[in-house]
Regions:
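Short sequence motifs at beta-strands and strand-loop junctions characteristic
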Residues: 34-36, 62-64, 96-99, 122-124
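Short glycine/proline- and aromatic-enriched beta-strand/turn motifs that initiate or cap beta-hairpins
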Residues: 17-60, 67-69, 133-137
């Protein structure tokens, strides 16, 4: 594991166009009532290449509990201020399981991002989440 981390750091140091972002998690909309829509939290996202990035952080989830997340993201479209991608990773802090796999599409324009997370349980909800993505380097 430490070799993998060292390789990632080495590769990210070699890429001059890589950027790091502060993620400010903030709000969500659910298609069913009873869920928390104020999802404050912070995260870090780092570009590994023109199309690949990794991210991790914490937020207050839709069940009013603390969650940590980590994911890899592939940006399949980057033009002007648009950045469209697909992310795959894992999240903690939900009642359903201690760690839940996740995959979601995300659309960013300038600093504003929106993601869509589909319902995973019959009694759950589809959710659209919103956050800011601010360059810090």
């Amino acid at each position: 594991m430490k070799y993998l981390m060292a390789l990632c750091l080495l590769l990210s140091a070699q890429i001059s166009m890589a950027e790091t972002y502060l993620q400010i998690n903030g709000a969500s909309w659910h298609d069913r009532p009873g869920y928390n829509s104020v999802n404050y939290g912070l995260g870090i996202e780092h570009e590994l290449s023109e199309h690949w990035s990794v991210a991790g952080g914490w937020y207050r989830n839709s069940e009013y509990l603390g969650s940590t997340y980590a994911y890899g993201r592939y940006a399949f479209y980057k033009q002007d201020q648009w950045n469209l991608g697909i992310a795959v990773g894992a999240v903690t802090g939900y009642r359903r399981a201690s760690v839940i796999p996740m995959a979601f599409p995300e659309a960013c324009y300038a600093w504003a991002c929106a993601l869509f997370a589909p319902r995973v349980e019959p009694t759950g909800a589809n959710v659209v989440g919103f956050r800011l993505r601010i360059p810090i380097d």
